[in-house]
Amino acid sequence: ATSVASGVINPVTGRRIVQTWMIDTLLPFAIDAYKAFQQEENIKIIKATPIKLIHPSLQMKESFDYRLTHDNIYLNENNHSSLGQYFNTPFGTGEIDQCYWIDLIQFLKAGREKISTHFIEDYFDISDLILTEQGVQWKNIIAEKIIFCDGLNTMNNPYFKALPFVPNKGEALIVKIKGLAPTNIYKTNITIVPWKDDL
């Protein structure tokens, strides 16, 4: 799932355009961590990429305008009239600043290579997992803790069966839009994220 994720760090969220939880603490940490990783690995994986927000409804525009004047340092009222040639903009546009795009494909590839000597690629059958007084055991590996990264399959994990999951499987469509600046993210009912080679 991560390989088709958009890799966007957005400091605001939801229909009410509120600041993402703990963003003032997490954003500087994330930026420093990604920049340190790219310097260490000599690759480019993080890029400041503002979000051009196309208001899909009057309600969303009103929420944006309210947050803009009250408590959101990440919003900018820039009205991008030029977006009208690419999007339906009857409710206007705005901008979210301090957003970042992470090249997840490069990041995962470099990260996998970096930990390759500490990495086991194998099929994990949860019935082989043994809980012990000290932690867990799987095959010949003994550890204090286990971290599940099951994605959508977590719904089938017996350790999480009591949680009320709502599946949210995203889809990616790769398109080329002639003339649309690849230096921004565009968000309305869908999100358009620049990838590579003007895609």
Language-model features and meaning:
Residues 1-3, 7-8, 13, 44-46, ...:
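Active-site substrate-recognition segment that forms the wall
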Residues 5, 116, 143-144:
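Short, well-ordered alpha-helix to beta-strand connector turns
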Residues 7-92:
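Dinucleotide-binding Rossmann-like beta1-alpha1 core, especially the glycine-rich loop
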Residues 37-41, 113-119:
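A structural motif corresponding to the C-terminal end of an alpha-helix
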Residues 92-97, 131-140:
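Generic recognition of long tandem-repeat/solenoid scaffolds
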Residues 93-114:
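Mid-domain beta-loop-alpha active-site segment that forms a flexible
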Residues 119-135:
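A conserved short coil-to-beta-strand element within the FAD-binding core of flavoproteins
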Residues 141-153:
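Short hydrophobic core segments
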